Amino acid sequence: MITLAVDIGGTKISAALISDDGSFLLKKQISTPHERCPDEMTGALRLLVSEMKGTAERFAVASTGIINNGVLTALNPDNLGGLKEYPLKNIMEDITGLNGSVINDAQAAAWAEYTVLPKEICDMVFITVSTGVGGGIVVNRKLLTGVSGLAGHVGHILSGVTDTECGCGRRGCVEAVSSGRAIMGAAKNKLAGYSTKYIFELARQGYKEAEFLTERSASTIAELIVSLKLLLDCQVVVVGGSVGLADGYVQKVSKHLSIYSEICNVMLFPAYFRSDSGLIGATLWDRDCIT
C-alpha cells in the first residue's frame, strides 16, 4: 500500500508518498501559510498533494496543534495563523478522494521513534524543539493521544523562566523559552533579526549572547525532561525538531541533565528519522489504525 503522508509544521508543510517498506517514493515541501484564513491552508494542501494523490491508497496527516476527532485547533495562536476548529480530516478527504487519519505531529513522531528503540523499552517521550515545542508520550507500549488530543503538549508546561509570555496566554511556558521562535524573539542588539540557525552558528563561534540563548533553551529542555521523568518514569527521551537536531544541541541538553539527581537519569537520543519522523509516524499510526 502506498500512503500519502503529510506533516504540517509551524514553518513548513511536507508531503511524501511512502511505500509498504517505508521507502519514500516522492517528497515535496512548501512554506506554511500564516494568514488567519482556513482557505489559505486548504489551498496550500491542495497544491502540495495535487500530483501525489492519484498514486496513493490512503492519506496520513501529522499536524502541529490539537487534533480532536480529525479537527485541528492551534493551541498557540502564533502557530498556523491561529487556526481553530479546522476540519482537517474532512478537508483531506475532499482534496484527495481517499480515506485516512490525522494525528498530532509530535505524537506521530513519538510513534515512529518508538518503533526503532530496543524491544525492552516500553515507556518513552519524544520532544520536538522547533518553531514551537511539542511532545509525544508512549506508556506501556501505547501512544497517549488523550480524550481530546491534548496529550503530550509538553511545550506548555511551565519552566523556571517566568518573564516570557507564551502565545497560549500563559507566562513561562517551555515553548516561550526554548523554541526557535522564542530564541529569535529574545535576540537583542547585534543578534536582532537573525535566524535561529545563524544564532546557533554564532554560539559555536563563542558569541556570548548567542551562547546564552542556546544554553537557556537547552537547560530549559533538560528541566522539562527531569519533570517528565519524575511524572512518567520514562526510560528514553528522544529529541527532534529543527532546533533539537541542531549540531550539538542534544549534547547541551545532556550536559544540563547531568547536574540533576542520578534518580532522574534517562537515556537521551536525537531523532533517528530526523526531520521525517512525523511523516513516518503518521503512516505507521494510520496502518495500525486499520489493522
From Swiss-Prot:
**MF terms (GO), sorted A to Z:** ATP binding; N-acylmannosamine kinase activity; zinc ion binding
Specify which residues bind ATP according to the UniProt entry for this protein: 5-12, 132-139
Biochemical pathway: Amino-sugar metabolism; N-acetylneuraminate degradation; D-fructose 6-phosphate from N-acetylneuraminate: step 2/5
Give the keywords, sorted: ATP-binding, Carbohydrate metabolism, Kinase, Metal-binding, Nucleotide-binding, Transferase, Zinc
InterPro entries for the chain: ATPase_NBD, ManNAc_kinase_bac, ROK, ROK_cs
User: What catalytic reaction does the record list?
Assistant: an N-acyl-D-mannosamine + ATP = an N-acyl-D-mannosamine 6-phosphate + ADP + H(+)
Q: Which domain of life is it from?
A: Bacteria
Gene3D superfamilies (UniProt xref): 3.30.420.40
Summarizing the function annotation, the protein's role is: Catalyzes the phosphorylation of N-acetylmannosamine (ManNAc) to ManNAc-6-P.
Instruction: Outline the subunit composition.
Output: Homodimer.
Q: What is this protein called?
A: N-acetylmannosamine kinase
